Amino acid sequence: MIVTLMNLLRACWRPSSNQHARAGSDVAGRQDGLLWYKDTGQHVNGEFSMAVVQANNLLEDQCQIESGPLSFLDSGPYGTFVGVYDGHGGPETACYINDHLFHHLKRFASEQNSISADVLKKAYEATEDGFFSVVTKQWPVKPQIAAVGSCCLVGVICGGILYVANVGDSRVVLGRHVKATGEVLAVQLSAEHNVSIESVRKELQSMHPEDRHIVVLKHNVWRVKGLIQVCRSIGDAYLKRSEFNREPLYAKFRLREPFHKPILSSEPSISVQPLQPHDQFLIFASDGLWEHLTNQEAVDIVHSSPRNGSARRLIKAALQEAAKKREMRYSDLKKIDRGVRRHFHDDITVIVVFLDSSLVSRASTYRGPSVSLRGGGVNLRSNTLAPYASQM
């Protein structure tokens, strides 16, 4: 069982690319201290940019972009898959999602010979079930894995359609060109499940009318049972199955009263919409970015700057805001090491997906460039990474 857990953690720190990294190239991304980035790359529907900055002692954010086949069939469908997994309590759940969710999506897409909301829902269910199997196996030797979970944001572009699925509070924002004014408008596409939002609190309260303490205001922050801000996630077994909410789990995670139905849900909010020629780019990011930038600020930064390095540019803007809030210089914030850095900002993951309308409108049988890439942290093997190109 220990071997299973070590393999799971080791997978978090292994970069993935279907191309071989060449010395001095940035195929697998570049590392600059706590920042990992891939400034530009090609996907089936255009270009992309990725960046991850680490704040926790162990990076809890994971992410991936997969471009090309979305099933195991030669006939397709083909497209682009984007995943942002913001872990909490540890890296294990986010790592597990990174290793399994896309595989499950391809399996169900093969069965249905298409991408659909149902395929996404089944992929989430299979990922949740798989991680619960890990928790069950690890419980006797590592019971605290029951208190590890992850938000999970996924976007799939296939045949001119954008599918978005989400649990938790990561966010995808569309940059849409408004012809009449020349502006690029920010349009949020994902529903969030954070109980700081009044409508989310009310929904949870309506689902648990017998529990007056289903949401608690603690240190001026709303939390589910006083423990966690999100009400939907992958993992977090201790708030979904009562058999994992007992000793030897740490007392701070154990509820005083037993519960008879899951408190948290793993069911994703899913939206499906056709992409339009005036839809220019998508910004997928963990909540670490949105704590410091508004949707429109992020869209304006991407729109007003070169595509190359756009994800890294967004992270820099967020860190500058984080430094300003603490009345310190950005240059001094960058000197703070992981672990201590978490007092100033969260792990931040950003993937900017640019949309080429001539490519987006092609049928789902169009193969395009094949890419498989995962974001990383300081735990990546250094020999797979090129040295950084410039100061952030």
Swiss-Prot record:
Subcellular location: Membrane
GO molecular function annotation: metal ion binding; protein serine/threonine phosphatase activity
Gene3D superfamilies named in the record: PPM-type phosphatase domain
Alphabetically ordered keywords of this record: Hydrolase, Magnesium, Manganese, Membrane, Metal-binding, Protein phosphatase, Transmembrane, Transmembrane helix
Family, as annotated: Belongs to the PP2C family.
A GO CC term assigned to this protein in UniProt: membrane
Native organism taxonomy: Eukaryota, Viridiplantae, Streptophyta, Embryophyta, Tracheophyta
Keyword Ligase: no
One Pfam family recorded for the sequence: PP2C
Annotated transmembrane regions: 145-165
Gene Ontology terms: biological process: regulation of intracellular signal transduction
Domain PPM-type phosphatase: 47-355
Manner of cofactor binding, per the entry note: Binds 2 magnesium or manganese ions per subunit.
Keyword Hydrolase found: yes
Residues involved in Mn(2+) 2 binding: D86, D287, D346
Record's bilayer topology term: Single-pass membrane protein
Name by which UniProt lists this protein: Probable protein phosphatase 2C 60
The reaction(s) this protein catalyses: O-phospho-L-seryl-[protein] + H2O = L-seryl-[protein] + phosphate; O-phospho-L-threonyl-[protein] + H2O = L-threonyl-[protein] + phosphate
Enzyme Commission number(s) from the entry: 3.1.3.16
InterPro entries associated with the record: PP2C, PP2C_BS, PPM-type-like_dom_sf, PPM-type_phosphatase-like_dom
Residues binding Mn(2+) 1, per UniProt: D86, G87
